[in-house]
Regions:
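Phosphate/NTP-binding elements of NTP-utilizing enzymes
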Residues: 2-390
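Nucleic-acid-processing active sites and adjacent nucleic-acid-binding tracks
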Residues: 170, 212, 405-426
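Extended hydrophobic-aromatic, low-complexity segments
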Residues: 229-231, 246-247, 399-400, 412-415
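Gly/Thr-rich phosphate-binding beta-strand-loop-beta motif of the actin/hexokinase/Hsp70
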Residues: 382-407
Length: 426
């Protein structure tokens, strides 16, 4: 298929048909993103090209491996997300100076430059959806297929966490499964004085992963603005940007430097977090405005998976809204165990709701269940065994004595005696 401004993308078309048939359940945010994609299809100024996405799929399935060395077979969701990046293009009219053939003088001509539409992709999806593997595929593709010299970075709240993007690439280099990687890894990295033909062309070094044919580099950077601003990177992946207590807008810092390149790409992947009022919440508010149409930005792709309501946690058939790869990269049994754990161990409830179902909750723990906070009638406890606890503080300030009376039904009666000194009272 050549460029078309009317064609429906292949993998999005298959996904949309499955949604309309009721085979795939989607939440409100994904539904709004589908409306945005339908708007791109109807826009005559935006063009779809299937060659790039099919080339990406062919490269991944012929050359790449999983972290453990098994052959990689792209999930349907990977194809859907990658199609948004590689499938859409638009043309920009530019006036370019062309010298005359004899070298004397010249003139300006108008040219149409083809540019990739999507510069940023946000992927908010539950834990266990292989999102880091997706980011690794994107980085690997640009590192080894893009013939220009690219500087690529990956960042995460910790440096070791960012290695999750690098690890599958290192495994693919070691395995050298396909013809391209066999060629790139042929030779020895120690051969620095002999023929360049006998040197390895792709290797993991102390800098990162280097492609010596093009001079391209993929490296890990710490997730703070000081280490990320001013970079002229062409491709950047940001992992778990909602999970940590991140108070800086690192995605904005990366974009300011990356925008020096005409076709930069930033892929930000994360599961929902439990830390509120950080930069991640501000970004999510912006994404919500884009999805609702309050703020038009066709250069951003948003795949925001979550349950529509906390009531759906008890409905296993709705869990696919939060993790479309459920049953492929993570089992239903794992989810069921976490649901049971959230019911039996309330301290873990917020984290499970956020990480497994995309429901933003504040805080990490709470001590009392709802039932334990309900008021009880006043009771007296006399001539019963008890346990005594005392908080003597500084002795001259505040003292508290608490008596716990074990009851026959497994609960405890509580009595407290609290005292302050006359000095504190004054």
């Amino acid at each position: 298929m050549a460029l078309s401004n009317t064609a429906t993308p292949i993998y999005y078309g298959q996904f949309r048909d499955a949604v309309l048939r009721g085979d795939i359940l989607v939440n409100q945010e994904i539904s709004m993103e589908m409306n945005r994609i339908d708007g791109l299809i109807a826009n005559p100024g935006v063009w779809y090209d299937d060659e790039a996405i099919n080339g990406f799929i062919s490269f991944c399935e012929n050359e790449l491996t999983l972290t453990d060395g098994e052959d990689l077979h792209l999930l349907d969701t990977f194809k859907l997300w990658a199609e948004q990046i590689f499938g859409w293009y638009y043309f920009v009219e530019q006036s370019v100076y062309e010298p005359e053939p004899d070298g004397h003088g010249g003139h300006y001509v108008t040219k149409y430059i083809k540019k990739r539409l999507i510069n940023k992709q946000f992927l908010i999806i539950a834990r266990g959806a292989a999102k880091s593997m997706y980011g690794s595929c994107i980085q690997n593709y640009f590192l080894n297929v893009d013939t220009s010299t690219t500087h690529q970075i990956t960042t995460a709240p910790t440096m070791k966490q960012a290695e999750e993007i690098m690890s599958p690439i290192k495994t693919a280099i070691t395995r050298s499964r396909g013809p391209l990687f066999k060629f790139l890894t042929e030779g020895s990295i120690q051969n620095t004085t002999g023929s360049k033909a006998n040197r390895v062309k792709l290797a993991s070094t102390k800098k990162g992963i280097e492609n010596f044919l093009t001079g391209s580099l993929l490296e890990v950077r710490p997730m703070n603005i000081d280490k990320l601003q001013g970079l002229r990177c062409k491709v950047a992946t940001v992992d778990e940007w909602l999970s940590g207590d991140i108070r800086e807008d690192v995605i904005g810092a990366i974009e300011q430097g990356a925008s020096k390149n005409p076709d930069y790409l930033i892929v930000a992947m994360s599961s929902e977090g439990t830390v509120r009022n950080g930069s991640g919440d501000t970004i999510k508010m912006e994404l919500a405005d884009i999805l609702k149409g309050k703020y038009v930005n066709p250069h951003v792709s948003i795949w925001w998976y979550k349950l529509d309501s906390i009531d759906e946690v008890s409905q296993p058939d709705k869990w696919i809204k939060a993790n479309p790869n459920l049953g492929k990269t993570v089992s239903y049994e794992t989810y069921q165990l976490d649901v049971d754990r959230a019911e039996k161990a309330p301290a873990n409830r917020n984290d499970i709701l956020a990480k497994r179902f995309g429901i933003p909750m504040e805080g990490y723990t709470y001590y009392f269940t709802y039932e334990e906070t309900l008021p009880h009638r006043k009771r007296d406890f006399w001539q019963m065994p008890c346990a005594l606890g005392a908080d003597l503080s500084q002795g001259d300030d505040f003292c508290a004595f608490t008596f716990l009376f074990p009851l026959s039904n497994g609960s405890f009666g509580v009595k407290t005696r609290n005292y302050i000194s006359s000095l504190t009272l004054k």
